[in-house]
Amino acid sequence: MKEIKVIIAGPRGRMGHEAVLLMERTEHFNLVAAVDYKHGGEKISDLPGMPALDTPIYADLHTCLEEVEADVLLDLTTPEVGKQHVTLAVERGLRSVIGTTGFTEEELKQLTETAKEKAVGTIIAPNFAIGAVLMMKFSQMAAKYFQDVEVIELHHDQKLDAPSGTAVKTVELIRQNRESKQQGHPNEVEQLKGARGANVDGIHIHSVRLPGLIAHQEVMFGGDGQMLTVRHDSFNRASFMSGVKLSIETVMNLDHLVYGLENIID
């Protein structure tokens, strides 16, 4: 396979660290630069626990793009920074794979239009774990037969957004096969505000944040005399790397924006 030159934004994070290791062990990936506002001017090898790579680190993406030629930006930063990075990448005609979440419908619409106008491949993935993508697809299928559903997503206590992008995407897919329906008693009253979680067309989403967790989600469907639970667990961040690899390889052949890995797997 032809070499793919990659820039990683956010190499110090746990996902970023796994992505650097992925670059090192994948023959056709070439990590040409990284972006980290705290370590501009250093090298990947200068960061604790990193492999001995001479890859330069830039303090900001704009400067990096002025000095480095790349094929793909892999962004694993925070929601706000990720939004800035993907906007800049699309405007510059650089393909990007975005692992941050928190995009609004309007932001996604604008990015989709710009990516189409520039004919630049972009993938925004709420979850890179193939198992999580299958969980979402299975939940979408089940929604045809079970109209009563609630979502419980559980993540580590350092996660910045709630609900998770995976939960939001799951509900979006379920809604495609389910008419709006209020789940629970029509006259129910929350004795404590928020006790029933977020409500999207009658689908309740509950967010749990605790140390010891990584990324987990249960989609619970209820019916007369039965329940169906679809669950996925990521026990470490290595579980996301197969999806990262697939996304980087796939985005090279795209000329538009794709939201969600379920749209690129068979």
Curated annotation (Swiss-Prot):
Q: GO CC annotation: what is one?
A: cytosol
Task: Indicate the family of this protein.
Answer: Belongs to the DapB family.
Q: Which GO terms describe its molecular function?
A: 4-hydroxy-tetrahydrodipicolinate reductase; NAD binding; NADP binding; oxidoreductase activity, acting on CH or CH2 groups, NAD or NADP as acceptor
Where it mainly occurs, coarsely classed, is: cytoplasm
Q: What is its EC number?
A: 1.17.1.8
Q: Where in the cell is it found?
A: Cytoplasm
Q: What's a GO biological-process term for it?
A: diaminopimelate biosynthetic process
Annotated source species? Bacillus cereus (strain ATCC 10987 / NRS 248)
Active-site annotation: 155, 159
What name goes with this protein? Answer: 4-hydroxy-tetrahydrodipicolinate reductase
Q: Which UniProt keywords apply?
A: Amino-acid biosynthesis, Cytoplasm, Diaminopimelate biosynthesis, Lysine biosynthesis, NAD, NADP, Oxidoreductase
Binding residues for (S)-2,3,4,5-tetrahydrodipicolinate, per the UniProt record?
A: 156, 165-166
Describe the function of this protein: Catalyzes the conversion of 4-hydroxy-tetrahydrodipicolinate (HTPA) to tetrahydrodipicolinate.
Pathway this chain belongs to: Amino-acid biosynthesis; L-lysine biosynthesis via DAP pathway; (S)-tetrahydrodipicolinate from L-aspartate: step 4/4
Question: Quick one: which residues bind NAD(+)?
Answer: 10-15, 99-101, 125-128
Enzyme superclass (EC)? oxidoreductase
Give the binding site residues for NADP(+). Answer: 38
